């Protein structure tokens, strides 16, 4: 009995520690990019996956102690996919006492009509979903739209664009929407996916599977995700350093003439950002810059979330 109580206390301690880390990550992202302001009404896009559940939970937690006042409204888009458990999210949100709206739109039918069998439907589905969410934000009077993309998503997008698109472009933590009317924020931008997985598992969120539409996952993104996971396992700190690099760009040492005036460099020009160090012996730190291992990182092997069995 004492052993059980000891394990329970340890689990609660670890959960509290994990929640504090996620809360700190979200708080830093909000502050760095001015994501939330006084009086904001945040539309939290809730898909039923681990990321959006975690985002809602951490924002609710921050709402209680933040120095500014803001409100939350959770929104789920029921796309009429076969087997979608439409009772799960309303029951969960009512239990929490969170304001919410379920938007019912048969985008599944539209996608099936337009896309040949066996082809990836994600692109069209995403465009349809985006338009509906923008419209819903206007109807609800939301000042910001919050999406659940995390640090790993941002890095994956960067490498996808580098490897397949020939450009250095990631996923912005804050942006103006396609229609020019809404500000979109990603509060989980600094959060690690493995932290989100552990948190969702500990909180026992009622996870809804994301493949009810039958669409195949993006193979290119999967390749990138596997590569980054392998690097994270074999070279601790590399992921953190790469993400830091996204926040520490030196345009004068790249090759984009739109970002730096290379043609304007003439005799007498000032040295910019250290000049040319290509022939110097660089001092590379033994540990990745700015990386500190977390105490509980050794327990992160092969974590998976159970999802609700849809009958």
Curated annotation (Swiss-Prot):
It comes from the Bacteria. Its EC number is 2.8.1.-. Binds 1 [4Fe-4S] cluster per subunit. The cluster is chelated by three Cys residues, the fourth Fe has a free coordination site that may bind a sulfur atom transferred from the persulfide of IscS. GO terms for cellular component: cytoplasm. Its cofactor is Mg(2+); [4Fe-4S] cluster. [4Fe-4S] cluster binds at residues 122, 125, 213. Homodimer. Catalyzes the ATP-dependent 2-thiolation of cytidine in position 32 of tRNA, to form 2-thiocytidine (s(2)C32). The sulfur atoms are provided by the cysteine/cysteine desulfurase (IscS) system. This is tRNA-cytidine(32) 2-sulfurtransferase. It comes from Salmonella schwarzengrund (strain CVM19633). The gene is ttcA.
């Amino acid at each position: 009995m004492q052993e059980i109580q000891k394990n329970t206390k340890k689990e609660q301690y670890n959960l509290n520690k994990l929640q504090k880390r996620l809360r700190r990550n979200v708080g830093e992202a909000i502050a760095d990019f001015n994501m939330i302001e006084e009086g904001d009404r945040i539309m939290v896009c809730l898909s039923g996956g681990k990321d959006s559940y975690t985002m809602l939970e951490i924002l609710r937690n921050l709402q209680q102690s933040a120095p500014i006042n803001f409100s939350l409204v959770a929104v789920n888009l029921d796309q009429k996919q076969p087997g979608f458990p439409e009772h799960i999210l309303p029951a969960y949100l009512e239990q929490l006492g969170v304001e919410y709206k379920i938007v019912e739109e048969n985008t599944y039918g539209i996608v099936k009509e337009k896309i040949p069998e066996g082809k990836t439907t994600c692109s069209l589905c995403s465009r349809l979903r985006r338009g509906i969410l923008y419209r819903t934000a206007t109807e609800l009077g939301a000042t910001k739209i919050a999406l659940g993309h995390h640090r790993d998503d941002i890095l994956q997008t960067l490498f996808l664009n580098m490897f397949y698109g020939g450009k250095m472009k990631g996923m912005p933590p804050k942006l103006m929407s396609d229609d020019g009317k809404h500000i979109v924020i990603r509060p989980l931008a600094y959060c690690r996916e493995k932290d989100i997985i552990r948190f969702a598992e500990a909180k026992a969120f009622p996870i809804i599977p994301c493949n009810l539409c039958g669409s195949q996952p993006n193979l290119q993104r999967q390749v990138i995700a596997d590569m980054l996971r392998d690097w994270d396992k074999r070279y601790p700190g590399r992921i953190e350093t790469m993400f830091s690099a996204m926040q520490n760009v030196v345009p004068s040492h790249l090759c984009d003439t739109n970002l730096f005036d290379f043609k304007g460099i003439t005799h007498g020009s000032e040295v910019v950002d250290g000049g040319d160090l290509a022939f110097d012996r660089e001092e590379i730190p033994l540990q990745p810059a700015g990386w500190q291992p977390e105490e509980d990182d050794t327990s992160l092997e092969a974590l998976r979330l159970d999802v609700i069995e849809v009958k």
